């Protein structure tokens, strides 16, 4: 079971991604969602998760700032954004992938496979 957290300032984006993930793969559990990055930090630091789906453009703190404030990064990070120009920066910040909104089902499938590969490599180390 993959345990994930979604952080996005748009509730509809959270709802849509949660729905797509649960319909795509029954082995994915969304353990929490947050619309404010600063409120997500403590929970992410205290949780045992496999993946963080993270929006970049948020009002009080952007996704890159959130990543800098995390105590640990032993999980896969997937950037979700409507802006193509964040893709390279996301990968430079050690995200394993990015998804452009609106999220394409084929892209989501490829991302889920990357998460599973990432986690199996980390678990075997």
What would you call each of these model-derived segments?
Residues 11-13, 37, 56-60:
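Short hydrophobic/aromatic-rich motifs at helix boundaries and adjacent loops
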Residues 10-32:
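Two-component/phosphorelay signaling modules centered on CheY-like receiver
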Residues 18, 33-42, 63:
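Helix N-cap/capping motif at the beta->alpha junctions
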Residues 7-8, 34, 52:
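Conserved sequence signature across two-component system core domains
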Residues 41-46, 50-124:
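CheY-like receiver
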């Amino acid at each position: 079971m993959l345990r994930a957290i979604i952080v996005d300032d748009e509730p509809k984006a959270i709802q849509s991604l949660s729905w797509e993930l649960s319909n795509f793969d029954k082995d994915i559990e969304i353990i929490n969602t947050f619309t404010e990055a600063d409120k997500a930090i403590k929970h992410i630091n205290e949780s045992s998760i496999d993946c963080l789906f993270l929006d970049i453009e948020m009002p009080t703190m952007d996704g890159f700032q959130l990543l800098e404030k995390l105590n640990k990064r032993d999980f896969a990070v997937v950037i979700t954004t409507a802006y193509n120009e964040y893709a390279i920066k996301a990968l430079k910040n050690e995200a394993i992938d990015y998804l452009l909104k609106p999220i394409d089902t084929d892209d989501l499938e490829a991302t889920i496979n990357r998460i599973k590969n990432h986690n199996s490599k980390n678990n075997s180390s």
